[in-house]
Each structure stands twice: as structure tokens, then as C-alpha cells.
């Protein structure tokens, strides 16, 4: 599928990682109306995200699976879910959490439980959903497509954005029915590709 195939109206758009780049671009292009589960976390492995989806988020953010890594700023603690290989950069604030005690855990868990419930409801009720993932292999995405096909009642599309050494937007020919895969320049990917994202998302709207 090419970029033309993902155009149109959607009931919901979700980022599936790997960082917050997708969420920032959705926000900048007025396509973000709520927070998703993977919006503000680090999820470096789509393989682990696939397991998370397949398990329908069972044991996600389970306290016994969390490892406190370090302070990453004056305000934030980095905490890692070692089962799903997901890092929380922005959720555990230093006014309530330390290197030895997550005093704000209950509040964070409640927030993510709400996001999970909304995500699963959208999968059941939406007519059309768009998922966007940065950094993924063909094999991982083929597995993702199969997992989502078993979870979603109606139609969906997946946009994969891999950052490589290309110097312009490149569409890839992946033989997956619901997937559009592209490559964007890796150099300064947080700021230098805004015009590409604007073009990619220009003909996508939320109902």
C-alpha cells in the first residue's frame, strides 16, 4: 500500500512508538484528541509491543516488573518495564518518586489503565483506525498486522516510518494488505522532517 491508501477519515489514530515523535507530529497537525498508551514512552522493540497487544496489556506496568533506572532530569525519573521492554520517561515525577520508592505509582497505573480501556474500546467500536509506528522491520510489522486483525472489529491501516540514510521521502513496496511503509531522513529527524509529516498527514482527518 502507498501513501494514497492511508488517506481519508478515521475514528481514531494511535501511535505505536517507538518514541514520542509520532505523538508530537499528530499534535502539530491537529490529529491528536487524546493520549494513547505508547505516546510518551520509549518502546524500542516492536516485537515487544506485539506481545503487549497480543496479551491485551496483561501485567503492563506491574510493579514487580518495574526497574528504577535513574534521574533523567530535575523533574523526571526513568522507570523501565522489564517484561515489555518499555521505558517511562515522563510519568514518574521526582516530587513523588525516588531511586528507591515509587510513591506516585498508583497514580501512574490508574492513568494508563484508563488509556488501555479507551484503546480497547476504540478497537471494538471504530469503523476505521490508523496506527503509526516509527522504526520497525517487515517481519515485525507482518506480525503486528496479524495481531491487530484479530483484535479489531472493522477496518484499519498501519503507517510505518523508518528513519534511514535517505535524503528524501521514499515509499517502500511491502506486500502487506493494510500497511504503508516509508523511509524518511534520519538526520535531525525530530525537526528536519516536519514538511514531510505535514504532507503525509495532509489528507487524513478525524471524525
What do the predicted segments below correspond to?
Residues 1-207:
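Extracellular glycan-modifying ectodomains
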Amino acid at each position: 500500500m502507498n501513501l494514497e491508501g492511508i488517506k481519508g477519515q478515521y475514528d481514531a489514530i494511535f501511535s505505536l512508538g517507538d518514541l514520542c515523535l509520532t505523538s508530537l507530529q499528530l499534535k502539530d497537525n491537529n490529529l491528536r484528541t487524546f493520549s494513547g498508551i505508547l505516546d510518551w514512552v520509549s518502546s524500542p522493540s516492536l516485537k515487544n509491543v506485539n506481545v503487549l497487544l497480543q496479551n491485551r496489556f496483561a501485567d503492563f506496568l506491574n510493579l514487580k516488573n518495574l526497574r528504577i533506572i535513574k534521574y533523567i532530569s530535575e523533574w523526571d525519573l526513568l522507570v523501565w518495564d522489564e517484561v515489555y521492554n518499555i521505558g517511562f520517561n515522563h510519568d514518574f515525577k521526582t516530587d513523588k518518586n525516588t531511586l528507591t520508592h515509587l510513591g506516585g505509582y498508583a497514580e501512574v497505573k490508574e492513568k494508563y489503565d484508563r488509556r488501555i480501556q479507551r484503546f480497547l474500546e476504540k478497537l471494538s467500536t471504530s469503523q476505521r483506525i490508523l496506527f503509526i509506528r516509527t522504526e520497525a522491520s517487515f517481519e515485525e510489522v507482518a506480525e503486528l498486522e496479524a495481531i491487530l486483525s484479530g483484535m479489531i472489529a472493522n477496518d484499519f491501516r498501519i503507517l510505518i516510518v523508518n528513519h534511514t540514510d535517505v535524503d528524501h521521502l521514499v515509499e517502500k513496496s511491502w506486500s502487506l494488505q493494510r500497511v504503508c511503509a516509508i523511509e524518511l531522513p534520519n538526520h535531525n529527524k525530530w525537526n528536519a522532517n516536519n514538511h514531510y509529516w505535514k504532507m503525509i498527514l495532509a489528507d487524513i482527518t478525524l471524525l
